[in-house]
């Protein structure tokens, strides 16, 4: 299962105004956060499921990182906290030479992914 920052460029929105689009994700990921603040989620995911809730929390964390200016991305790069890291393909696998070394896109060793994975566990219920 992979999550990753997307490769699209658009405008900005706040995480509270997140647009969600279901589509067939061609790269095998379940979802991606877009630079305009929207989230693309794979059409195979039941949008009302606990899995979708977890995925959306993960992608909203990426949107928050983008909004705060801590993260940005383009087709061939990811910016994290002011430093640029390049995307590559190695043996058919998309990797990023990030601050913690070369890891596949979506890997928890990337600090932006570690934060997003932690956000999946946050309970937002107001009981």
PLM features: residue spans?
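Short pre-active-site segment immediately N-terminal to the catalytic Zn-binding motif
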Residues: 37-56
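Acidic glycine-/aspartate-rich tracts in secreted/extracellular proteins
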Residues: 46, 69-70
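Active-site recognition of the HExxH zinc-binding catalytic motif
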Residues: 54-67
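Metalloprotease/metallohydrolase-associated module, dominated by Zn2+-dependent proteases
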Residues: 7-27, 35, 73-127
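Short, surface-exposed charged micro-motifs
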Residues: 30
